[in-house]
């Protein structure tokens, strides 16, 4: 019964949060008051709050109480190969994109990431993106994608403020079937921090990614920065 009670309390609080009973930054009632209003013990309430905190819905500060957290976009491992637009739509959010640069250039040192000679041409696309209701109005990702020019020669003529990068790739027979990704927490370079509207030394989650097609060709190399305060990543591992 205790387990069921904890689940009921958690769902009641989640419904209140999702229903707008609390705003970002609001302090929830004291544990004694909240437990009494819900008719449960403080240990049961704390168990429910701990679960809500793990989901990023609330933040508990020792000595100060429990506060409503800013919502975070959950990036699931199962959707890592979906475009960011599709991922936002799965969470019923609206995506807005700004293209910062789109140009053809020499591969240089990036050639190694795409199995190209340094003299080869690649197309570089830099964007920052917003998702409604997340990030407190700031961009939720800054990403730079590099693609071999020979695989997508008209990429620089596309409008990536509205077009889906992965859909355009697939229209040219370049479906990303699997990817190799490395995640780490970093202090982003100054130009990235500025694009994400981060304060100095505010951390970001950096994702370094190489995408492969069904033939094993490297079709994209992406460098993405997500503000740590508005992002969560779910990694599922099977044995």
Segments (PLM) and residue ranges:
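Alpha-helix C-terminal capping/helix-coil junction sites
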Residues: 17-18, 53, 170
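All-alpha effector-binding/dimerization core of bacterial HTH-type transcriptional repressors
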Residues: 71-239
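Short, hydrophobic-biased segments on the C-terminal half of alpha helices
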Residues: 49-50
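A short, structure-level motif marking secondary-structure boundaries and short turns
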Residues: 15-16, 33-35, 41-42, 69-71, ...
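Extreme N-terminal segment that seeds HTH/winged-HTH DNA-binding domains in transcriptional regulators
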Residues: 1-42
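Beta-hairpin "wing" of winged helix-turn-helix
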Residues: 22-25, 54-63, 69-70
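ATP/adenylate-binding site constellation spanning eukaryotic-like Ser/Thr protein kinases
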Residues: 31, 63, 81
């Amino acid at each position: 019964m205790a387990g069921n009670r904890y689940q009921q309390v958690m769902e009641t609080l989640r419904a209140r949060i999702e229903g707008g009973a609390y705003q970002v930054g609001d302090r929830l009632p004291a544990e004694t008051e909240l437990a009494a209003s819900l008719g449960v013990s403080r240990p049961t309430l704390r168990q429910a709050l701990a679960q809500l905190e793990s989901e990023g819905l609330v933040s508990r500060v020792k000595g100060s109480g429990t506060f409503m957290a800013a919502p975070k976009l959950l990036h699931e491992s199962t959707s890592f190969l979906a475009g960011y637009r599709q991922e936002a739509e799965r969470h019923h959010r609206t995506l807005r994109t700004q293209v910062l640069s789109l140009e053809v250039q020499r591969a240089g040192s990036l050639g190694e990431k795409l199995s190209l000679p340094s003299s080869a041409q690649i197309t570089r696309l830099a964007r920052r993106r917003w998702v409604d209701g997340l990030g407190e109005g700031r961009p939720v990702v800054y990403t730079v994608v590099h693609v071999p020019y020979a695989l997508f020669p008209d990429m620089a003529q596309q409008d990536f403020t509205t077009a889906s990068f992965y859909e355009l790739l697939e229209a040219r027979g370049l479906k990303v079937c699997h990817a190799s990704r490395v995640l780490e927490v970093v202090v982003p370079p100054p130009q990235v921090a500025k694009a994400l509207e981060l304060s100095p030394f505010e951390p970001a989650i950096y994702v370094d990614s190489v995408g492969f097609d069904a033939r094993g060709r490297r079709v994209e190399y992406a460098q993405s920065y997500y503000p740590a305060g508005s992002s969560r990543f779910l990694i599922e591992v099977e044995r």
